[in-house]
Structure formats: C-alpha cells, structure tokens
C-alpha cells in the first residue's frame, strides 16, 4: 500500500513524435503539487524508432506490437533505473492505436516488467477504462493543469495550450474545490498543430521541422485554403472532443500547389486559427494562454496565436513550469490519484459519462508471488 500524505512519484511520457522518453518526479498527494523533482530524457535510437513506426496503427496480437512493447519497456527500464526515491511510477507507454468508439486504445508496454525492475508499484494503461466507458481517453493532463494553476496561486481561470502534433486546450478554474468538480475543467483538442508543418518540411526539404518558423515567416497565408480548412466538421463540434494526428490528412494536399514558404505560412496559420476557434468555447475569458509542447519554440506560430486569439500567449515557463516535462509530471500526479481512488477524467475533459479513475496498478510484491 502507498503510504499516506505526499509521496515522490515518477512519471513518464513518450509522445507521437517518437523522439524518446521524458521522465520526471513530482512530490504530490494526488491533489496538491508540493515540489518538482529530477527530470531526465532518453532518446530513441533510429533502430528503436523504426520498430515503433512499424507498429503504429496496429493492435495486440500482431508481431510488430510485441516488438514495440519490448523496445518501450527496455527503454523505460533503462531510463527510470537512474532515478532514486520514487515511491510509485506512472507509466504512459507508447500509443500505437487510438480509436474511441471503435476498437479502443492501446499503449505499448506493460507496467509489470517495470514494477519488477524498479521494485515499486507502477500505474499504467491510463486510457482504456475511459474509452471503454464511452470517453475519448484523452486528454488526461487537465487535472494536472488544475493542480499547476493552484500551485501557482492563480485566482482566476487559466488556460493551457499544448502544441504537439495536435493542439489541445485546457481551461481551468482553480477556485473550484477539485478538478473533477463541475465548472473546474474543460479540455479538448483544437486541431492540427505541428504535425502538418513537420510533415511538409520532411516531404519537401528533408527537415524535421520549421526551425524558429523561419520558412513560414517568408511566406504569405493562402486565405482560400485556410477558409476551406476551417469549414471542416470538426470545428462545428462542441467540446470535449479529440482528434487523431491524421484526421486532417487532406491538409497537406491542399497546399501542394503553394511555394514552400507559402505552404509553411498557411499551415502555421491553420494551427493558430484552430486554437482561436477552440478558445471561443472557454466558459469565461482568460488573460493568458500558457503554452507547452514543441510549438512554443516557434515565434511565428506564437505571434499568429496572439493575433488570432486576442489573448496574450506565453511559454509555460513564465508560470514556473517545465514545458518539456509537463506531461511526464502529469502521469506522476495521475499515478498517485489512481492509487488513492481519485478520478483521472471527467465529462468535461474526455466526454466520459461520469467521473472516472483509470489506470491499472502492478505491484512488485504481487508479481513475486506469481508462479
């Protein structure tokens, strides 16, 4: 059993970019964040990335999925062994397939191997219960955002914007009693963010991303393409809502006839315009968007966001948070919530019918008793 009060929790995140694994420690009781601890990163090798790429979109029972699980578990075991003092681990795994309302969701990697290797309880498979109950299974960081706003002493609603492959917004009111309370959190995906820009750069120029937004800065936005993008049915749906990375697969073909610079400018504007559409759903206005994820390093995107939303847009570091480790910290926090029977999602965050605590826990002592 996990002791009472605050404990040091270690969380991990491996995102859709397949770059590597983030790991971070947080001192928390599952409600408050008392202290931030050590952080580490382990990059995937090219060989490991190739195995993971081969498993994307596949489901358990296929050989590629088993091979991906081996890579994920070994990489995490190596990284997490370097930490000291963790009393519980929140292990997200690597999402390979995610079909809410369809086949479900699957993250490669079992918490059992990590529990045996590390000798502490491991919480994993955070999303399946939410999806099985009718939720989207994402996003799961909003309850942590609520705790971050509380820790920062916020006395009014705050919004967090994550700019990864897909963008997502979290609106929180830290004046509410708890993150699962009615009116405390609203979260949803905004639309494509970095993914189309990165795909364009890779396809046309062999680069992983538009460094500093320099290419977009040289181009002009194709307003007709942008208008067609904003006509997509996704933008008419009310939140909460989630989006697969490839749901807007027609966006790259839409800029095929544009120059490299104009295409980059148009895709960057599309990411900003999608966020502006999303911000219109906030229950009450906010003064700032606190931005996390790789997109915060793109000054052109940040400027477009500010222009289109009319809200001050700042990197989350200005609030004393670590924009590179926020999601890993979130799964450390969520692990303690799971261990203590607290909810990890709500109707206003994933669309699940009622507040729900997801996750499975593997304990090393229980595994040792297995034949």
Swiss-Prot record:
EC number(s): the record gives 2.7.1.170
Q: Which SUPFAM superfamilies match?
A: Actin-like ATPase domain
Pathway per the UniProt entry: Amino-sugar metabolism; 1,6-anhydro-N-acetylmuramate degradation; Cell wall biogenesis; peptidoglycan recycling
Q: Name one GO molecular function term.
A: ATP binding
Q: Which reaction does it catalyse?
A: 1,6-anhydro-N-acetyl-beta-muramate + ATP + H2O = N-acetyl-D-muramate 6-phosphate + ADP + H(+)
Transport among the record's keywords?
Answer: no
Superkingdom of origin organism: Bacteria
Keywords assigned by UniProt, alphabetized: ATP-binding, Carbohydrate metabolism, Kinase, Nucleotide-binding, Transferase
> What residue stretch is flagged as signal peptide?
none
Top-tier EC class: transferase
Which residues are ATP-binding? 15-22
- Any one biological process term the GO annotation gives: amino sugar metabolic process
A single Pfam family it belongs to is AnmK
According to its UniProt entry, the function of this protein is described as: Catalyzes the specific phosphorylation of 1,6-anhydro-N-acetylmuramic acid (anhMurNAc) with the simultaneous cleavage of the 1,6-anhydro ring, generating MurNAc-6-P. Is required for the utilization of anhMurNAc either imported from the medium or derived from its own cell wall murein, and thus plays a role in cell wall recycling.
Regarding protein family, the annotation reads: Belongs to the anhydro-N-acetylmuramic acid kinase family.
* PANTHER family, alphabetized: ANHYDRO-N-ACETYLMURAMIC ACID KINASE
Protein known as:
Anhydro-N-acetylmuramic acid kinase
């Amino acid at each position: 059993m996990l002791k009472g009060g605050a404990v040091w929790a270690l969380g991990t995140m491996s995102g859709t970019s397949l770059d590597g694994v983030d790991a971070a420690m947080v001192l928390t009781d599952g409600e408050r964040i008392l202290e931030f601890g050590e952080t580490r990163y382990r990059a995937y090798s090219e060989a490991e990335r190739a195995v993971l790429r081969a498993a994307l979109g596949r489901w358990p029972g296929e050989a590629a999925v088993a091979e991906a699980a081996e890579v994920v578990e070994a990489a995490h075991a190596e990284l997490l062994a370097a930490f000291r003092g963790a009393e519980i681990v929140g292990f997200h795994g690597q999402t390979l397939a995610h079909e809410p309302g369809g086949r479900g969701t699957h993250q490669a990697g079992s918490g059992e191997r990590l529990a045996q290797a590390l000798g502490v309880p491991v919480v994993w498979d955070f999303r399946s219960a939410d999806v099985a109950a009718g939720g989207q299974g994402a996003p799961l960081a909003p309850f942590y955002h609520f705790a971050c706003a509380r820790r920062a002493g916020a006395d009014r609603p705050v919004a967090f914007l994550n700019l990864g492959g897909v963008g997502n917004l979290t609106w929180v009111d830290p004046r509410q009693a708890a993150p699962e309370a009615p009116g405390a959190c609203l979260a949803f995906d905004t639309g494509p963010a970095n993914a189309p820009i990165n795909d364009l750069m890779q396809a046309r120029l062999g680069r992983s991303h538009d460094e500093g937004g320099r290419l977009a800065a040289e181009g002009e936005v194709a307003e007709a393409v942008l208008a067609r993008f904003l006509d997509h049915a996704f933008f008419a749906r009310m939140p909460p809502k989630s989006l697969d990375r490839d749901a807007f697969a027609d966006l790259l073909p839409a800029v095929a006839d544009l120059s490299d610079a104009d295409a980059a400018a148009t895709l960057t504007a599309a990411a900003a315009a999608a966020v502006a559409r999303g911000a219109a759903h906030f229950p009450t206005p906010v003064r700032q968007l606190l931005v996390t994820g790789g997109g915060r390093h793109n000054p052109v995107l940040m400027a477009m966001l500010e222009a289109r939303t009319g809200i001050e847009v700042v990197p989350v570091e200005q609030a004393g948070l670590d924009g590179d480790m926020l999601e890993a910290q979130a799964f450390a926090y969520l692990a303690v919530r799971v261990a203590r029977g607290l909810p990890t999602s709500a109707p206003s965050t994933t669309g699940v019918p009622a507040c729900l605590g997801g996750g499975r826990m593997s304990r090393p002592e229980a595994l040792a008793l297995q034949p």
